[in-house]
A protein has these predicted regions:
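Conserved phosphate/anionic-ligand binding catalytic regions in large, soluble enzymes, centered on
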Residues: 10, 58-64, 145-155
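Polybasic, low-complexity association/targeting segments
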Residues: 1-23
Length: 161
């Protein structure tokens, strides 16, 4: 639940540099996640930690490796005022939660202990004793995330094999 905080316009090439895409396995992606702006990220991030960033998170390339790298590191979610649309869609498609909340993204600090209740949209900063209300996911998107991604959701509904 520890926060890693970054600025605006975090590009997909910063999340996972293109030079590391020759091995698209989750473990390989995780080992290089955020290394160009935070060389210690991959070695210090723990399951359940949260990334908070400025607007337009995930801009740049359309590849799904960027949200997959974050998910593979164990990141619980990303909180930002806005996301590049293709990153948003790719994150949902792989079952990785992203939360839009400008005030929380501005006020949460690096190192804070934060929790997010995806069913209600409530973001709680335990360190600061503050809460913010984000819009919860619509039911169909929540279902995709809970299933672990679009393909798993379709399989559960018998639409795909």
């Amino acid at each position: 639940m520890k926060v890693y905080k970054y600025g605006a316009n975090v590009d997909t090439d910063v999340i996972i540099p293109a030079r590391h895409l020759n091995d698209p396995s989750p473990a390989a992606l995780a080992s290089h996640c955020m290394e160009d702006i935070d060389p210690d990220f991959a070695s210090t991030v723990e399951a359940g930690d949260i990334v908070v960033a400025g607007p337009n998170f995930g801009c740049g390339s359309s590849r799904e490796h960027a949200p997959l790298a974050l998910k593979s590191c164990g990141v619980k979610c990303v909180i930002a005022p806005s996301f590049a649309r293709i990153f948003y869609r790719n994150a949902i498609n792989i079952g990785f939660p992203i939360v839009e909340c400008a005030q929380a993204a501005e006020e949460i600090q690096a190192g804070d202990q934060v929790d997010v209740d995806f069913s209600t949209g409530v973001i709680t900063d335990i360190t600061q004793g503050k809460t913010w209300q984000a819009t919860p996911f619509p039911e169909f998107i929540d279902g995709i995330i809970k299933s672990g991604g679009l393909l798993n959701s379709l399989k559960e509904r018998g639409v795909a094999k």
